[in-house]
Amino acid sequence: MADRLVRATAAGGGIRIVAVTTGETTRYAQSRHGLSYLTTVMLGRAMSAGLLLASSMKVSHGRVNLRLGSDGPIRGLSVDAGRDGRVRGYVGNPGLELDPVRTANGQAGFDFTSAAGTGYLHVVRDEGKGEPFSSTVELVSGCIGDDVASYLLHSEQTPSAVFVGETINSDGLQSSGGLLVQVLPKAAEEPALVALLEERCREIQDFSDQLNRCGDHPEQLIQQVFPDLDPQPIPSGEPMQPVEFHCPCSRERSLGALTLLGSEELNDMLENDRGAELTCHFCSEVYKVNEDELAALIKSLA
């Protein structure tokens, strides 16, 4: 089933909840970039988190960019997510694999902390008007969810819980997705409600398991986690938003990027390489430019 995102409020509008499934999206990214299991999971989590952040943007063309800059062997990670449900992303070292570590429940898990190393999470929110808003926070764990929650608390002053997860077996990635829970000003003034919400979030011991049990139904995930808070989709009756991996790169854009190199550099490429080859970082699409096309491009710059 196709990936989807659903928005809801709970507790009479005092709590905002967003759930997203990204299984198909993550599997597509894995095939495009040739990702290992570790980098598949890290990119899947980052794409889920990016979509959760973009879900609150006021305009349909608004976008959020997440960039992990660190000294870890993953060599960086970048995600571009839109309010429209379209997302793309890549990692610097797609084939990275590390030995598993023991998680809190005693099971073997991915070593996100070693993969990410120490560094920062950079977030840019672009509403399509004026200057984009950017913020940087130190990485908390490299697990993505904790890092994004830290960003929301320190940069947007919004108490939030962010859960991202996945399930993998011998057949590959089975599920991927995320859940965002935010306390709105109305609820912040009700200590009992805040305490109940915190209790529900603490009860989420294994988000990946809950995600897998809900399959491709994000609305069931919300009902399962918060049954006593009366979650309601917003706006009522709105179909869930489709989510997909989408990159707007094109041959025309690639040719435009080549012109930025200038005629001298292009002439050198024509003489020595007899053409040019460009690869999109976000989707690994390769664009080849032959001699005639490169010569015409140089002529257009004269």
Swiss-Prot record:
Q: Does the keyword Chaperone apply?
A: yes
Q: What is its main location?
A: cytoplasm
Give the subcellular location.
Answer: Cytoplasm
- Disulfide partners: C247-C249, C280-C283
- One GO molecular-function entry: unfolded protein binding
UniProt cross-references to Gene3D superfamilies, sorted A to Z: Hsp33 domain (3.55.30.10), HSP33 redox switch-like (3.90.1280.10)
Q: Which InterPro entries match?
A: Heat_shock_Hsp33, Heat_shock_Hsp33_C, Heat_shock_Hsp33_N
The similarity annotation says:
Belongs to the HSP33 family.
Q: What does this protein do?
A: Redox regulated molecular chaperone. Protects both thermally unfolding and oxidatively damaged proteins from irreversible aggregation. Plays an important role in the bacterial defense system toward oxidative stress.
Q: Which HAMAP family does its entry note? A: HslO
Q: Under what name is this protein listed?
A: 33 kDa chaperonin
Q: Which organism is it from?
A: Synechococcus sp. (strain WH7803)
